[in-house]
Curated annotation (Swiss-Prot):
<keyword id="KW-0689">Ribosomal protein</keyword>
<protein>
    <recommendedName>
        <fullName>Small ribosomal subunit protein uS2</fullName>
    </recommendedName>
</protein>
<dbReference type="GO" id="GO:0022627">
    <property type="term" value="C:cytosolic small ribosomal subunit"/>
</dbReference>
<feature type="compositionally biased region" description="Acidic residues">
    <location>
        <begin position="243"/>
        <end position="254"/>
    </location>
</feature>
<keyword id="KW-0687">Ribonucleoprotein</keyword>
<dbReference type="GO" id="GO:0003735">
    <property type="term" value="F:structural constituent of ribosome"/>
</dbReference>
<dbReference type="InterPro" id="IPR001865">
    <property type="entry name" value="Ribosomal_uS2"/>
</dbReference>
<dbReference type="InterPro" id="IPR023591">
    <property type="entry name" value="Ribosomal_uS2_flav_dom_sf"/>
</dbReference>
<dbReference type="InterPro" id="IPR005706">
    <property type="entry name" value="Ribosomal_uS2_bac/mit/plastid"/>
</dbReference>
<dbReference type="Pfam" id="PF00318">
    <property type="entry name" value="Ribosomal_S2"/>
</dbReference>
<feature type="region of interest" description="Disordered">
    <location>
        <begin position="240"/>
        <end position="262"/>
    </location>
</feature>
<dbReference type="InterPro" id="IPR018130">
    <property type="entry name" value="Ribosomal_uS2_CS"/>
</dbReference>
<dbReference type="GO" id="GO:0006412">
    <property type="term" value="P:translation"/>
</dbReference>
<comment type="similarity">
    <text>Belongs to the universal ribosomal protein uS2 family.</text>
</comment>
């Protein structure tokens, strides 16, 4: 069964590219035709590319890896947050702060500040501090959560990056490429596909299209996690089986020894 259907893609408007005057010639192989000055993306290729990206993300997840979802344009913000959270992954859906990947040591200090402020409130310090200072602390906290809340539990580098619109997320892509982190991306007709390891040729401006494709990548993560769970259960069952066999062998040996001595 295909990961995604042509019907789903058509209904979400995935096939609508940019105006013909705003295009990247490198995307030519993913374009089906032109209609009323708009490029139409070849959805047969999109179906195939979604499957390739899905299988890659699934494997990353199955191997115990984590995915960082990135989409800071308005059309992507809600879907990126919702789908990343659904799959238990990291996300950045506001402005990309330089160094999130390449200077994580510094970024992690700012993330630590989130917990510090939370502890101050839990310990009742907000009740004794001057009101003005509490207001400033709350503003700082809200700002940190807004920009770093989606990566506050990211203790090490992700094993894959999923981006919506490579043009918009060029800084995130540059950092990922420096660290050789594979990139999956929704790539419209005005983008450079060479920057992306797993290209999903699609409309990156329609909310429904972005939600559909981001959701499929989250599904891939969840399916991979299910594979991990199944493997862990199988491994545990094998261990229990081995222990049972060893126990039975020991009992058998003990019985034989008793018989021989009698």
């Amino acid at each position: 069964m295909a990961v995604i259907s042509m019907k789903q893609l058509l209904e979400a408007g995935v096939h609508f590219g940019h105006q013909t005057r705003r295009w990247n010639p490198k995307m030519k192989k993913y374009i089906f035709t032109e209609r009323n000055g708009i490029y139409i993306i070849d959805l047969q290729k999109t179906v195939k590319k979604v499957e390739e990206a899905y299988n890659f993300i699934k494997q990353v997840s199955e191997d115990g890896g984590r995915v960082l979802f990135v989409g800071t344009k308005k059309q992507a913000q809600e879907s990126v947050k919702a789908e990343a959270e659904r799959a238990g992954q990291f996300y950045v859906n506001q402005r990309w702060l330089g160094g999130i990947l390449t200077n994580y040591k510094t970024i992690s200090k700012r993330i630590k500040r989130i917990s510090e402020i939370e502890k101050m409130e839990e310990d009742g310090l907000f009740d004794v501090l001057p009101k003005k200072e509490v207001v400033e602390l709350k503003k700082e906290y809200d700002r940190l959560i807004k920009f770093l809340g989606g990566i506050r539990d990211m203790k090490s580098m992700p094993q894959a990056l999923f981006v919506v619109d490579p043009r918009k997320e060029r800084n995130a892509i540059a950092e990922a490429r420096k660290l050789n982190i594979p990139i999956v991306g929704i790539v419209d007709t005005n983008c450079d596909p060479d920057e992306i390891d797993y290209v999903i040729p699609a409309n990156d401006d329609a909310i429904r299209a972005v939600k559909l494709l981001t959701g499929k990548m989250a599904d891939a993560v969840l399916e991979g996690q299910q594979g991990v769970s199944n493997d862990e259960v199988a491994a545990e069952q094998n261990i229990n089986l081995d222990e049972k066999e060893e126990s039975q062998e020991a009992e058998s040996t003990e019985e034989n020894t008793t018989v021989e001595s009698n």
